[in-house]
Each structure stands twice: as structure tokens, then as C-alpha cells.
Amino acid sequence: MHEKRRERGRTYRVGLILGFCLLIAVNGLFPVSCVYAEEEQTKIAYGENTPGQLYARSAVLMDADSGRILFAKNAETERPMASTTKIMTCILALERADPDESVSVSANAAAQPRVRLGTVEGQKFKLKDLLYSLMLESHNDTAVMLAEHLAGSVEQFADEMNQKARELGLSHTHFVTPNGLDGADDGGSHRTTAEELARIMRYCVMESPKRKEFLEITGVSSYQFSDLEQTQTYSCINHNAFLTMMEGAISGKTGFTGEAGYCYVGALKREKRTFIV
């Protein structure tokens, strides 16, 4: 009897993995690299009761409550992380600044490549509004605006991101940019692993003192705001398709660069359990 229950549970867990893989394959959303998580008591290696082809180059399953890794495929391989970087940018902004602070646009921020909010030097915005721009539309100029506001420069903010990574015990993660554009510095390339990216998301949704605010921002379908001078209104649409496609999805961030490929990290709740996706 107990063996049958365990087998049903295992089938459910593998089914969850298959479900995500099917969504990814059919919809073409994130075919290259993504992070999954779900509750289990024993670690499942890739190839053991898993789909014959898991198209992600790296993937993990994690129990979000305990942080236990339950499924892994190349989970410790260092790779660029594209715009999934912005979950760290967002949580640092929430933890270290007042949401009503005024943020100015520098020439450097305004010159960032697409995708961007489309700001001009000298514009001012409320910090809270920029966090929706960052997480829903993944605007690169917004990430630089926040980095410069919080730390004075992109380079100094990268140092603060790396300090936070060390506090979280992440030894294979290195930040160079606040927006996830590919880059390198004296510490090496902009990179993380599937496991460590999942741990960053776990911190954002489970452990941070600003987790409620993080979930509020990343869980909405759309948001509208204006600059402080009321000269222009901006509309943001959440591009995390899993919020509507997957029951229980509560947060997530997409990403893409030529070097990173397609990336995804997210969180969902099922039957009172929290998973990292």
C-alpha cells in the first residue's frame, strides 16, 4: 500500500516535470535553459524516470520550503543567465530603497539597447514604477537606472549583487551587469548555474523581508505609470506566460541573449506546496 502511494507520488512529480517540458516544447517559450522545482525526499538524476529528451541544457527541481534539490540536469554547470539576472536587481532595490524615491535617467541608462523603456536623459521616475518596468517588460535602461541610483554606478552595483550572492552561499554566480546583458570583468563572465539561480528565486519569494512586494510586482498581468513630470505614460505587460498557462504560478522571469539562449526561472504553488520553476 505504501509502495503504491510512493509510486503515485513519484508519478505525479515526474508528471509535473513532463507538463512543464510539454508547455515549453509546444509553445516554444523557453527551449534552451530553465529552472524547475518541486517537493521530493530523494534526488532524481536526469535520465531516471524523466523524459527521454529534456530540451533544457540545465535544469533543477527544488523544494522551495527546504531548498532541497530534487531533480538535476547539469545543475552545477556555469552559464550566462540573461534577464533572469533582474530578479536580483529587483530584490536589492526593494530591500535597500524607498519605493517612493525619485530616480533620474542618466545618459548611460538612456543609451541601453533594446528591450528598453525608451527614456531620455533627465527624466525622473518613482522607483516603485521602475520595478514593474524591470520585471514585467524586462527593460534594460530601467535596470541601469536602478543600479546607478542604488550604488552610483553599474560597476558598484555589480559588486553589491555579488556580495548578496556570497551572503546566499552562491559560489558559482558572478554578476557583471544589472540587466543580464552578456559581459565580463576581472571576476570573469556574467554567469550562474541552474541550481544557484533557483536559490536566488527561492530567496526572493520565500526568505527576503521584501518577498511580499516581490510577489506583488511579478504576479500582476499589467501595470501603467507616468514619469514624475507627467509628460509620458507607460504601459507594461507581464511577459511571464506561465502566470496564465500554469495553474498556481505566482512569479517568474524570462530571459534571452545570444550567448545565454532562452532562460526561465519562476515559482508556483500546488496543493499548499511551493515549487521553484
Regions found by a protein language model. Give the residues of each.
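N-terminal Lys/Arg-rich, disordered targeting/topogenic segments
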Residues: 1-11
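Sec-dependent N-terminal signal peptides
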Residues: 10-25
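Beta-lactamase-like hydrolase cores
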Residues: 15-18, 29-84, 101, 158
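Penicillin-recognizing serine hydrolase domain
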Residues: 41-54, 153-276
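Solvent-exposed, polar/charged alpha-helical surfaces in well-ordered, non-transmembrane soluble domains
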Residues: 68, 87, 91, 95, ...
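Short active-site loop at a secondary-structure junction
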Residues: 71-92, 102-103, 125-133
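Short, well-structured active-site flanking segments
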Residues: 95-109, 208-219
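Conserved catalytic neighborhood of penicillin-recognizing serine enzymes
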Residues: 112-145, 233-251
